[in-house]
């Protein structure tokens, strides 16, 4: 099997062309490939599949290191666009893809940055999914070690975002797993810890479901910016500083799609026997 190793701000991926190759990934195979000592090592495995709809260019699938399939990965989307361009699978600047829960347009800009139309943030609790009677800008979540206020939103995958005073001392290691598996999120959740610097600038750490804390989470950056704007803390555009680098998020409010712009880096190509 031919693959490429890529990263988006340190969030690393193995990307596989399933358009020209016949591949099959049982959960145990994904876990072996994800092992950083005995496999290749990655946060997520990305599959480029033929489109299910003739109006689209590709279908985009994402698997976590634990073998679970998820519907969205923003950093992965940028790497997906870079991959299909580098491999000559398309020569389009605007690439339309489907995911498990919707559609996205990936734009390769002239400066090499990739702008992703992430669609509209979803606030309705049942669609996140999140157990709540109605939408609120802040929800109270009780855990074994701390009660927190959080915003909840879906960017194609579920996110909760809590505001912290200092990102360096945020209790991500302990609170992250408790939020990820909180009973009010039936499909688990990605937990974002956000420090507001000013109305156009935040710092963020994300504990991702199925992956733990990562260097960067694109959909998490989108969720944090959207929650901050919805709560009246931020204005678009928002620079989001993650441990692995920065993203620019643009959102004009309800009824409008959210855009994420950032880099995607090709590291190397390889071949592995499955």
Swiss-Prot record:
Cell compartments where the protein resides: Cytoplasm
Regions annotated as coiled coil: none
Active site: 73 (proton donor), 217 (proton acceptor)
Marked site (Could be important to modulate the pK values of the two catalytic cysteine residues) residue numbers: 159, 208
Keyword Isomerase: yes
Catalytic reactions on record: (2S,6S)-2,6-diaminopimelate = meso-2,6-diaminopimelate
UniProt GO MF annotations: diaminopimelate epimerase activity
Function: Catalyzes the stereoinversion of LL-2,6-diaminopimelate (L,L-DAP) to meso-diaminopimelate (meso-DAP), a precursor of L-lysine and an essential component of the bacterial peptidoglycan.
HAMAP family for the chain: DAP_epimerase (MF_00197)
Protein name, as recorded: Diaminopimelate epimerase
């Amino acid at each position: 099997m031919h693959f490429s190793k890529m990263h988006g701000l340190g969030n690393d991926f193995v990307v596989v062309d399933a358009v020209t190759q016949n591949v099959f990934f049982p959960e145990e195979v994904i876990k072996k490939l994800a092992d950083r000592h005995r496999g290749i090592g990655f946060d997520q495995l990305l599959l480029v599949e033929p489109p299910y709809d003739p109006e689209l260019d590709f279908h985009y699938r994402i698997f976590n290191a634990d073998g679970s399939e998820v519907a969205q990965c923003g950093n992965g989307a940028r790497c997906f666009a870079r991959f299909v361009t580098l491999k000559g699978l398309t020569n389009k600047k605007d690439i339309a893809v489907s995911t498990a829960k919707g559609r996205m347009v990936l734009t390769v800009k002239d400066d090499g940055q990739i702008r992703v139309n992430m669609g509209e943030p979803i606030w309705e609790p049942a669609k996140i999914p999140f157990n709540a009677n109605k939408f609120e800008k802040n929800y109270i979540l009780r855990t074994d070690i701390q009660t927190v206020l959080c915003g909840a939103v879906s960017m194609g995958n579920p996110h909760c975002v809590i505001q912290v005073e200092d990102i360096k001392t945020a209790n991500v290691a302990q609170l992250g797993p408790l939020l990820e598996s909180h009973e009010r999120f039936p499909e688990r959740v990605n937990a974002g810890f956000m420090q507001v610097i000013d109305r156009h600038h935040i710092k963020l750490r994300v504990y991702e479901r199925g992956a733990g804390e990562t260097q960067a989470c694109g959909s998490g950056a989108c969720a944090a910016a959207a929650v901050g704007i919805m709560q009246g803390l931020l204005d678009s555009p928002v620079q989001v500083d993650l441990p692995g680098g920065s993203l620019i998020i643009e959102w004009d409010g309800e009824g409008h799609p959210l855009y994420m712009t950032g880099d995607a880096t090709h590291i190397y190509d390889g071949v592995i026997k499955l």
